[in-house]
Amino acid sequence: MARRRAGGQRWGFEQTLYGNENHIAGTPSLPHLKALLVDAAVRGHAVALGDCSGAFYQAPLTEENIFLEPPPEAGVESGFVWEALCAFPGLKGAPKAWEEHSAKELEKLGLDRGRYDGCLFVRFADNVKAGRHADDFMTTGPAQQLDQLMADLGEKLKLRDVVKLYRPGDEGTFLSMRVRRIEGGFTIKGKDSMVDDILQDLGLEDAKATIVPETKVETKSKDDEQKLEASDQLKYRRCVGKLLQLAPHRADIQHGIGVLSRGMANPTLRDQQRLKKMARYLIGTRDVELALVPGTPSDEVVQVYVDADWSDKKEDRRSTSGGILLYHGCVVASWSRRQACLALSSAESELYALGSGAVEALGFATMLGEWREQVVPTLYSDSSSALHVVKKRGPGRMKHIELRCLALQQWREEKRLLFGKVGTDENVSDMLTKPMPKERLIKLASMVGLRGGPYS
């Protein structure tokens, strides 16, 4: 079969609109990929990145009797068709076929596939680990064993363009992030081209930088209702889409990006003004990167800090939850989310934030368990009222959220989670719930490992 980039539909190959479960291929969680880097830093292991050439064409077909009309330039006599002998781009089952094929080859090399995250693999004999995102691989382990694994993957899966991060200064690209090895760990940074594209779309190439990404106080005006022109709406959505790719590594802008995302359906002039302020902030912080440098060994391997801003928006009075998950002192996950339910008190909104943090912590601990690393995460909140609800028995006066209260209480009683109090000034998740003044933002961002620009 000829190898062409064009999808099968252009060759007269028809598929049903909706597939089935055999067409769904998984991708690894970004926090789990960051955990691979942190684990390598803790153990002093090497890291290698690479991608497989012609991945889909390597996978055997999961369906039978797939035929295609040859393209006109092939010069095939009319009435003849091609029979597909392998998967190909455009075939719905191709991603799943490649996923299973690559997993089987990795298992032949002695790597066990994770059950919680099927895109992670580990070989306990020499502590070699691998994460696979489609045809891209991130692998860690002792240098000698990792070299052998790269050679084996090159032979079995045609792994190419291998970049080795063995010494400080080595760097490579994985997905849309630049990974660089430094003394004691790694740094992660989004592509600079994304910032350049945003500034170009908004006509801000020569603009001056702002010191904060968003303004806390906004006076109500007609700009709140004035819709953008169709062309400006398209630019708005394109810019916010690029910001969303930068967000996982930039906790300092996640809250602002969340606010911008709410205007995606019908962006207004006010939304555009917010976007331009965010873009000007990126001018002065384009060099900021997230450092993954493990701290001093501690019993608290996994820590989660959560916070909430109660009823912060007058439009719907829904609160905002923020959280940061640390693994060996390194930020592997952070989030800023609108709460789905209205909270009747600040304690209730903080309880919702604890619930979100608990789910993230338990999921991450489950993944670590498959690495034979048994941990009990610790959740920190600055709300004494919410922590009191968790530490007592029964919902008390909060009968309307009984299940949430009882779940947190049960996880604490089963010692699956620990809970602790943190001072408001030291709660790093505070910047994920509301706009911050300059000094406060610099302090919190520096505490979570952001480096470069205004951050130490």
Functional labels for PLM-detected ranges:
Residues 1-456:
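Long, low-complexity, charge-biased intrinsically disordered regions
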